[in-house]
From Swiss-Prot:
Pathway: Antibiotic biosynthesis. Heme binds at C350. SUPFAM superfamilies: Cytochrome P450. Keywords: Antibiotic biosynthesis, Heme, Iron, Metal-binding, Monooxygenase, Oxidoreductase. Gene3D superfamilies: Cytochrome P450. It comes from Streptomyces carzinostaticus. Its cofactor is heme. GO terms for molecular function: heme binding; iron ion binding; monooxygenase activity; oxidoreductase activity, acting on paired donors, with incorporation or reduction of molecular oxygen. The keyword Iron applies. GO terms for biological process: antibiotic biosynthetic process. InterPro entries: Cyt_P450, Cyt_P450_B, Cyt_P450_CS, Cyt_P450_sf. It is an enzyme of class 1 (oxidoreductase). It catalyses: 2-hydroxy-5-methyl-1-naphthoate + 2 reduced [2Fe-2S]-[ferredoxin] + O2 + 2 H(+) = 2,7-dihydroxy-5-methyl-1-naphthoate + 2 oxidized [2Fe-2S]-[ferredoxin] + H2O. The gene is ncsB3. This is 2-hydroxy-5-methyl-1-naphthoate 7-hydroxylase.
Length: 410
């Protein structure tokens, strides 16, 4: 069977998964520039792969095409490969890098951030409330994207005047429509922006994670310059995207289902149910690059060759009919089993999962309490995709904050 070419536009994430599922638990896919890989969308097989040491995260040791120079700096997915981060390391090196960040994401540390998160949420909601009643507001831009990026930039001590250039690389990093020229330029510009941030923080240290990482580097913790830069790339770039789309997808679910919204806001259905079901039915991440086979073997009924790259289709895993036999594509906040793998599994489980949930549990209830009459300003089928097969999201989420009636009354 011919490889299935993933759509760089990401226009039909779940439709693609349905077509791939017809080929079995793992399907052959074609990426940009004809690069071949495997996509796994089966829950059991994906969980096995994420815990199997025969799959490495390190392309520098295990992807022949990259090692041999066949993958250029202009490849649209190059930043997922070239960056030296804990997401591209295995074993002791991965553990060493992860350990440097663990203290920042403990339950106690995350809970201590509550006042700051609440203050940030209030500021964002106040900004939205200042809009005219008849003005259409993109809540993805003004709230869903702003909350995570502000929190991450605050956590890492990124000065306000440097945030735009630091965050720009992350936005381009998930855009799978990007041209070769733009991809290569982004790789260089993003590295330069992060390097400039590190140099600034060396001279202006603070009580933040960037300063702590620099101190660890300078005190001989075996953190290399490339690892320092790569770690900041990972957390300031991709680090906030999961929460951005989790916020947006859950808001959309509540906007299109008045009965669900009433039951949740009244307390009949717990908010945490919406959080978990959102992660299951609309995983914020779609096809996440990459894992690499370190030997030949068979899994999921297919033969994987040594060096083959693999993407995990998190958007498909949560809808696996073998796990969720009862209407897996439907959002059901009362579903007894909301099993998903949206934050990963095994040693690479998302470090920021606890913080993401904490921010969501503060932000989304506050959003719907502040704007109880909020309505979509377009039909659901008019919402456009984000332009990526790496993440699962919409380009925007336009609403009338006080409802259509208030807008029409102006």
């Amino acid at each position: 069977m011919c490889p299935y070419r993933l759509d760089p536009e990401g226009a039909d994430t779940h439709g693609e998964t349905a077509r791939l599922r017809e080929q079995g638990p793992i399907a052959r896919v074609e990426l940009q520039d004809g690069v071949l890989a495997w996509s796994v969308h089966d829950y059991a097989v994906a969980k096995q792969i994420m815990a199997d040491e025969r799959f490495s995260k390190n392309p520098r040791k295990n992807w022949p095409a990259y090692i041999n120079g066949e993958i250029s700096n202009g490849w649209p997915l190059i930043t997922w490969v070239a960056m030296d981060t804990m997401a591209t390391q295995d074993g002791a090196d991965h553990a060493r890098l992860r350990k440097l960040l663990l203290k920042a994401f403990t339950e106690r540390r995350v809970e201590s951030m509550r006042p700051h998160i609440e203050k940030t949420v209030k500021e964002l909601l106040d900004n939205m409330a200042a809009k005219a009643d008849d003005e259409i507001v993109d809540i993805k831009e003004m709230f869903h994207a702003e909350l995570p990026t502000r929190l991450m930039c605050d956590l890492f001590g990124v000065p306000e005047e440097r945030r735009a250039e630091v965050l720009a690389g992350g936005h381009k990093n998930i855009d799978t429509r990007i041209s070769s020229e733009a991809a290569e330029a982004n790789l260089g510009q993003w590295q330069e922006a992060i390097s400039d941030l590190v140099e600034y923080k060396r001279h202006h240290p603070g009580d933040d994670l960037t300063s702590a990482l620099i101190e660890a580097r300078d005190e001989g913790s075996r953190l290399s310059d490339s690892e320092l830069i790569g770690t900041l790339h990972l957390l300031l770039g991709a680090g906030s995207e999961t929460l951005v789309n989790a916020l947006a997808h859950s808001s959309l679910a509540l906007l299109v289902d008045a009965d669900l919204r009433k039951k949740v806001t009244s307390g009949e259905i717990p908010w945490v149910n919406v959080w978990e079901e959102t992660l299951r039915v609309e995983s914020p991440v779609a096809h996440l690059p990459f894992r690499y086979a370190t030997e030949d073997f068979e899994i999921g009924g297919v033969k994987i060759s040594k060096g083959d790259p693999l993407l995990v289709d998190f958007a498909g895993i949560g809808r696996d009919p073998a796990v969720h036999s009862d209407a897996p594509d439907e959002f059901d906040a009362l579903r007894p089993d909301k099993t998903h793998l949206s934050f990963g599994h095994g040693v690479h489980y998302c470090l920021g999962a606890r913080l993401a949930k904490h921010a969501w549990m503060i932000g989304i209830p506050a959003l719907f309490e502040r704007f109880p009459d909020m309505e979509l300003a377009v039909r659901r089928d008019e919402l456009k995709g984000q332009g990526s097969f790496v993440v699962n999201g919409h380009a925007s989420l336009p609403v009338h904050l006080k409802g259509r009636a208030a807008a029409l009354a102006r």
